[in-house]
């Protein structure tokens, strides 16, 4: 199934790139929470929804762009969790740091994940406890790697005072910034060793990256030390977390 999901992510990426390269208008509007949504978000959502319904018609789908109500999903044990375009702000900035995220959740855990960066044409994927990176047609296993001083990857769009204080107390380290779920992937492939995030995050923003990082050997825990959980609940928010090799 993983190969089919990867192809689906590529197809969604192709739809996004038609907007990114100017073939189709971007049409930026604001959602109720003031976050931006574009024609690319909607196009990718449509591709993924149609594809998953064909691939696995018995597994329900929760997508950021059309999340079903609590009464519909409260008893779900196995479901797809999708962010058709993670990093819409990066997309609008045209810096290439956005991804297509597709995860399969089973009893609260992401057991399969795909993170595809269309501009970079890089695919990260995970299933059955293994993680891969595919670039330039070459697919290889990836795993976490220690480094001293550690490289801490942080959000390009969500820096805050709490993060600044945390980094001041961390000890010797280096930092880099990147958008979207690529932060999870940098830890997964050994380029970074730590990704701290403070404040709540929507579940579709983390599930696919969580799957990739965990399969590569990283720990994805909240600040109380508990693994991030995707068991259906009324809120779509997970607490702050850290992705770490330690």
Curated annotation (Swiss-Prot):
Its cofactor is Mg(2+). It catalyses: adenosine 3',5'-bisphosphate + H2O = AMP + phosphate. This is 3'(2'),5'-bisphosphate nucleotidase CysQ. Keywords: Cell inner membrane, Cell membrane, Hydrolase, Magnesium, Membrane, Metal-binding. The gene is cysQ. Mg(2+) 2 binds at residues 83, 86, 205. GO terms for biological process: 3'-phosphoadenosine 5'-phosphosulfate metabolic process; phosphatidylinositol phosphate biosynthetic process; sulfate assimilation. Mg(2+) 1 binds at residues 64, 83, 85. The keyword Magnesium applies. GO terms for molecular function: 3'(2'),5'-bisphosphate nucleotidase activity; magnesium ion binding. NCBIfam families: bisphos_cysQ, PRK10931.1. The keyword Membrane applies. Pfam families: Inositol_P. Belongs to the inositol monophosphatase superfamily. CysQ family. It is an enzyme of class 3 (hydrolase). It is found in: Cell inner membrane. Substrate binds at residues 64, 85-88, 205. Its EC number is 3.1.3.7. Converts adenosine-3',5'-bisphosphate (PAP) to AMP. GO terms for cellular component: plasma membrane. It comes from Shigella flexneri. It is a peripheral membrane protein.
């Amino acid at each position: 199934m993983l190969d089919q999901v990867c192809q689906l992510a590529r197809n969604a990426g192709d739809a996004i790139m038609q907007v990114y390269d100017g073939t189709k208008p971007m049409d930026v509007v604001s959602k109720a929470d003031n976050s931006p949504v574009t024609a690319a978000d909607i196009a990718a959502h449509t591709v993924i929804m149609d594809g998953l319904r064909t691939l696995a018609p018995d597994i329900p789908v929760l997508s950021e762009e059309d999340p079903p109500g609590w009464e519909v999903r409260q008893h779900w044990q196995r479901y797809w969790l999708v962010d058709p375009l993670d990093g819409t702000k990066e997309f609008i900035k045209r810096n290439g740091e956005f991804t297509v995220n597709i995860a399969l959740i089973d009893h609260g855990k992401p057991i399969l994940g795909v993170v595809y960066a269309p501009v970079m044409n890089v695919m990260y994927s995970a299933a059955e406890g293994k993680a891969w990176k595919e670039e330039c047609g070459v697919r290889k296993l990836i795993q976490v790697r220690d480094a001293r001083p550690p490289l801490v990857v942080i959000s390009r769009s969500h820096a805050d005072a709490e993060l600044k204080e945390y980094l001041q107390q961390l000890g010797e380290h280096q930092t880099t910034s990147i958008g979207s779920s690529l932060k999870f992937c940098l830890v997964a492939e050994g380029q970074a060793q730590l990704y701290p995030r403070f404040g709540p995050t929507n579940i579709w923003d983390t599930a696919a990256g969580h799957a990739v990082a965990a399969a590569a050997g990283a720990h994805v825990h909240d600040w109380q030390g508990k693994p991030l959980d995707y068991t259906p609940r009324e809120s779509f928010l997970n607490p702050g977390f850290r992705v770490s090799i330690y």
